[in-house]
Amino acid sequence: MIQETRRLADEYEISEILGRGGFSVVRKGISRKSSSSSDKTDVAIKTLKRPFAPSNPPPLPPHARRNDQNSFAAAAFQTRKQVSISNVLLTNEILVMRKIVENVSPHPNVIDLYDVYEDENGVHLVLELCSGGELFDRIVKQERYSEVGAAAVVRQIAQGLAALHRSNIVHRDLKPENCLFLDNTVDSPLKIMDFGLSSVEEFTDPVVGLFGSIDYVSPEALSQGQVTSKSDMWALGVILYILLSGYPPFIAQSNRQKQQMIMAGEFSFYEKTWKGFLCQPKQLISSLLKVDPDKRPSAQELLDHPWVVGLSAREDQMDAEIVSRLQSFNARRKLRAAAIASVWTSSIFLRTKKLKSLLGSYDLKPDEIKNLSSHFKKICVKGDNATLSEFRLSCKRLIQLRLVSMSLRAEPARL
């Protein structure tokens, strides 16, 4: 399927960057095949960065070029490790996307792959362009948000998962930012995307299992047990919980504590938020968040559930407080995603722990986001791009302001 005789630039005009990851960048592309502007096809081009060959490794960071042999050895090891992981993730995503093209596409709820190119810069996946925005971005902008809308989201994700699972594909990293609307229309289909961490039967490298977003990771994945299609159903249960409450089911002051809560399936519906909901959606969440994966419903079974179908989901507008919390959660998620992507592109293994300790599990309010933006503009020497030390300084300043605010209110804050 990989085309080595054609150049990507000959087929597509490549324009703005749509997103970045630790090992990839996504740009918008416009087909050059048609002379008519109305017939031109817009696509998303995901470039998976080619890892360096062992005989031609990337340059070591400046601090490792000194005469400190321990420092040099450690940096060399981490560099080789990063190259190895990049190679695994690149190979894995191509394998999974090929399987999707063969057995799933076209599907209204799974992103479509049009073509693949390879050159000295890496492997380029030409994908269906989803211009309707991320799942939570769309929801927080809606004038009216109800259980019916949440059920429609779950239904579309379940439809996509059912098709993937029938082909023995497990997504492994299902989360809101990996669910995008195809366009800006009201009835736009919701597409599952980003299969870099997905698995195909027994053919996936074990390294892939080391990654994933902690909020959505299943107990069996945390315990390094067998990850199956039921692991995706756990993630969907977490998404549904957030859709109906505005916050995740597992909230803790540290990742270790959060992992323990996930392993024990320790969540509740005690807060006043849940008093306005009938039993059915809560029972559905409880079934999806069973610690025993065998007790969770499959995606196909979910599509027969009365609430998911929309028969028992209520049309009443949800409390404004839920939408407000969802906005805060979404803003915090974006900040952390940008921070982690920044770390992956620099000192991936050496600095992540320090950065996570700064970010914690804080729930950013609109005024805090505005303050944080202001601090970045003051602190960043080079304008838009922050160094890690500048980022650390801004986060510390945010935490200091929050502590002052908490002391003035003289009341505990939920982290």
From Swiss-Prot:
Residues 12-308 form the Protein kinase domain. Pfam families: Pkinase (PF00069). It comes from the Eukaryota. The active site is at residue 173. The keyword RNA-binding does not apply. Keywords: ATP-binding, Calcium, Calmodulin-binding, Kinase, Nucleotide-binding, Serine/threonine-protein kinase, Transferase. ATP binds at residues 18-26, 46. InterPro entries: CDPK_Ser/Thr_kinases, Kinase-like_dom_sf, Prot_kinase_dom, Protein_kinase_ATP_BS, Ser/Thr_kinase_AS. PROSITE patterns: PROTEIN_KINASE_ATP, PROTEIN_KINASE_DOM, PROTEIN_KINASE_ST. Residues 318-328 are annotated as: Calmodulin-binding. It catalyses: L-seryl-[protein] + ATP = O-phospho-L-seryl-[protein] + ADP + H(+); L-threonyl-[protein] + ATP = O-phospho-L-threonyl-[protein] + ADP + H(+). SMART domains: S_TKc. One of its GO terms (molecular function) is calmodulin binding. Its EC number is 2.7.11.17. Belongs to the protein kinase superfamily. CAMK Ser/Thr protein kinase family. CaMK subfamily. May be involved in signal transduction processes. This is Calcium/calmodulin-dependent serine/threonine-protein kinase.
